[in-house]
Amino acid sequence: IALPSFLNQANKAKQSEAKQYLASINKGQQAYYAEKSAFIESVDNIAKLGLGIKTGTSNYTYDLGESDVDGKDGVHAWTKGSGNGLKPYAGLVYLVEADGALTSETALCEAEDVAADPTDIAAPTVTGTAADVRNCSTVAGYTIAL
């Protein structure tokens, strides 16, 4: 009876890795954009963010891609592959206009369910307005805002 509870706690600990990695990537993307006016859109260039993180661990494999929110540039990072029983996650950084200037916002989204094929999780499809993205309501496959 205690084994399912233990496994659930173990998966929560593993999933916290994804949340921490994606939050770090989001912050790194914001800093990079502030300095270079561009985002890193390929996992091959993730070292340019200066985070010192790997693109894969025993729990998750991470990837990057470009997004468009309200017709403005953005980027997303997601857990492309995961261990069995682990939920997929996506982090997004996107530009919004505030007081006549562009600024960046972030979102961290969780999938409702464990992926059917944890070795090949599709990139999040991002549509809608910044407000929609902020609460993950238009990030296909990811519905829970963290």
Report residues per predicted region:
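Periplasmic/extracellular, small/polar-rich flexible segments of pilin-like filament-forming proteins
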Residues: 34-146
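Amphipathic alpha-helical segments typified by the pilin-like N-terminal helix
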Residues: 1-34
